[in-house]
Amino acid sequence: MAKEFGRPQRVAQEMQKEIALILQREIKDPRVGMMTTVSGVEMSRDLAYAKVFVTFLNDQDEAAVKNGIKALQEASGFIRSLLGKAMRLRIVPELTFFYDNSLVEGMRMSNLVTTVVKHDDERRVNPDDEKED
């Protein structure tokens, strides 16, 4: 019977914490900035590859996001070496960084719902406006 929370998930969870600390304390690249959040890590079953999902505080500008991801990808070797010192793994996984737009999409959906609710409340207050012929 397979475990619900296997080794790849446990390693990914610990790696997420360590990468967040490394980005906060060690990376000095201005393209990355101080406000980079590691929103998730997905590990391969053999623990050789890791997809790291990040978000940026200034993610309004698409060019800044692309530059941030590029900077992280260029620093992946350095991050990987620091990760190897922080975690005891036989193989330190190859890191690939991706922009996680789920936070932005969630905020967009929340704004849409708020707009619809506000419009619905206005229609309830003024029902005569809708039935004009």
Curated annotation (Swiss-Prot):
Subcellular location: Cytoplasm
PROSITE patterns recorded: RBFA (PS01319)
Principal location class: cytoplasm
GO biological process entries: maturation of SSU-rRNA
GO molecular function, one term: ribosomal small subunit binding
Record carries keyword Cytoplasm: yes
SUPFAM superfamilies: Ribosome-binding factor A, RbfA
Gene Ontology cellular-component annotations: cytosol
Alphabetized Pfam families for the sequence: RBFA
Keywords of the record: Cytoplasm, Ribosome biogenesis
Recorded superkingdom: Bacteria
Family in the record: Belongs to the RbfA family.
HAMAP family reported for this sequence: RbfA
Record text on subunit structure and interactions: Monomer. Binds 30S ribosomal subunits, but not 50S ribosomal subunits or 70S ribosomes.
Function of the protein: One of several proteins that assist in the late maturation steps of the functional core of the 30S ribosomal subunit. Associates with free 30S ribosomal subunits (but not with 30S subunits that are part of 70S ribosomes or polysomes). Required for efficient processing of 16S rRNA. May interact with the 5'-terminal helix region of 16S rRNA.
UniProt protein name: Ribosome-binding factor A
